[in-house]
Structures are given as C-alpha cells and as structure tokens.
Amino acid sequence: MIIDRLFNEVEKKGNVCVGLDTHLDYIPVNLKEKYQDIDEILFEFNKEIIDKTYDLVPVYKLQIAYYEAYGIKGLLGYKKTIEYLRSIKKITIGDIKRGDISSTAQMYAKAHFEGEFEVDFVTLNPYLGFDSLTPYLKYIESGEKGVFVLLRTSNPGAKDIQYLKVSPKDEYLYYIVGDKLNEIGVKYRGSCGYSSIGAVVGGTHIEEAKEIRNRYKNMFFLIPGYGHQGATGKDVSLYLNKGNGGVINSSRGIITAYKNYKDGDQRFADYARKAVLDMREDIQSERGV
C-alpha cells in the first residue's frame, strides 16, 4: 500500500516534505534567462532541487495553484515535474484541495489519480460533506493512492470555521471531521498501522497537537507551517508518533533558501539541500532520533 511505502520512506529518510510551490519570483534570473518557455523554467528549477534532495526526503508536494496561475504552460511544468518524480520512484502529493459534489469529484479524482496529472496522494477539502470524498475511495482501495483531508489547518482564519462548537457533544468541528475520517479510514490501513486516508494538521497551532495525535493514532498527518509560517521542529514533533506518522512540509524555506547567500543564484539547489539537512536535524533533535 502507498501508506506503507510512505511510512517506510519516513523511517529511512526522516519527515521532511519538500514543497515545490514554485513562483517565477522564486527562480534565479540566470535560470529564467536560460529558457524561453515557462514550463521549461519551472521544470528545470524543480528538477535541480529534486536532484539535490531526493536522497534526503521521503516525499514531494506540489501546490497546483502555483502552476495554474501560469496557464497551460504552467500546468505543463507541473506535469513534467510529477512525471519526473514518479520516474525516479519518489512519492508525490498533489496539493489540489478539491471539494465538490460527487459527480464533479469523480472527475477530479480521475484527473489526479490517472493520466497526465497522476500523483500518489492528493489533498481534499471535506466541507461539502463526505460524499465529496467517495469518488476517491475506489483509487484508495487499490492500495496505490491516498488522500490527506483538511482537518486543522495552519492559517489564522482556520478558527473561523474549524473552531465552531457542534452538537451533540459540543466539540470543535474539526474533531467531528476527524472522527468521521477515522471511521472511514479503518478499512484502508496498511501493515504499518496507518490509514491511506490521512489529514492535514497545521504545525502553527500546537495547543491541540497532543490531543489530535492521541485521538487519531492510526491517522498519518501532512503537517504544513514549518519555517516561514512560524512552526519549529519542537512544534511539529508533537504530531509525530515515535518519529513517524507524519511528514512536515516546507516550501519557501527550502526552495528560496539560496536568497540568503551571495552566490545563491549559481548554487540555489545546493542551498536547498542545506535547508533540508538543517530542517531534518531540527526535527530529529526534537523527536529524539
């Protein structure tokens, strides 16, 4: 199962997830001048970072909006990147945050679990109801695909909805969502004990971290918020279980790390590698590894 594969990769390489949320402003001028088409620029930047970090990390996440913003050429850059990652046997997360009625969700599932945009995991928004997740289940049942569903996110506005108290238990809404995901996810657990239906939990809101981890012992977490959003290794380690059970995403902190160095434009991929190593050490020092 894909969740077993991810678990095993985390065991070997640690918890860092490299976020390839690639904006043209993040790319060195010399690289942008070398290629004419946006898809080539995006892909070559991503590829150099991948080639310098693939031995260090278990998974890569691509936020599709950064590619959609550049139209067809941008999406071609997205396609080339995920195809390259899959060709070198790296696990991929398509950060698409889709959520729609079941007939439309069926098309989203087909788009991102088959064909040109195929990835191993996608992120989903559950707030249209759980029938919006149903079309993804046949892919999860195959053992080859998984999802991370928004649970407790890292943005400040998360409290506007996720913190609403819901009857009959008068609990926060995100716990109602989490309990339902936990219930659905039981049949999709791998030999590692975790389910291929995971959750997105923000590393910037640590006050509930231990309770969330203890409540959802079999749920694998995608944890954003490290670095630029303010979360530290100490914060995010609270969501882990014996050093596993989650991957921690950093995007700008890795792919724009080169901007802190005089020779960064020429060595941007080297500095991305250094940022990954520093992040991994920070997390491992807190998780006791």
Swiss-Prot record:
InterPro entries hit by this protein: Aldolase_TIM, OMPdecase_type-2, OMPdeCOase_dom, RibuloseP-bd_barrel
The enzyme's E.C. designation: 4.1.1.23
Catalytic machinery residues: 97 (proton donor)
One GO BP annotation of this record: 'de novo' UMP biosynthetic process
Pathway: Pyrimidine metabolism; UMP biosynthesis via de novo pathway; UMP from orotate: step 2/2
Keywords, alphabetical: Decarboxylase, Lyase, Pyrimidine biosynthesis
Protein name stated in the entry: Orotidine 5'-phosphate decarboxylase
Leading EC class: lyase
Source superkingdom: Bacteria
PANTHER family referenced in this protein's UniProt entry, alphabetically: OROTIDINE 5'-PHOSPHATE DECARBOXYLASE
NCBIfam families for this protein: pyrF_sub2
Reaction catalyzed: orotidine 5'-phosphate + H(+) = UMP + CO2
Species of provenance: Petrotoga mobilis (strain DSM 10674 / SJ95)
Record carries keyword Lyase: yes
Gene Ontology terms for molecular function: orotidine-5'-phosphate decarboxylase activity
Classification via SMART domains: OMPdecase
Organism lineage: Bacteria, Thermotogati, Thermotogota, Thermotogae, Petrotogales
Intrachain S-S bonds: none
Record keyword Lyase present: yes
Family: Belongs to the OMP decarboxylase family. Type 2 subfamily.
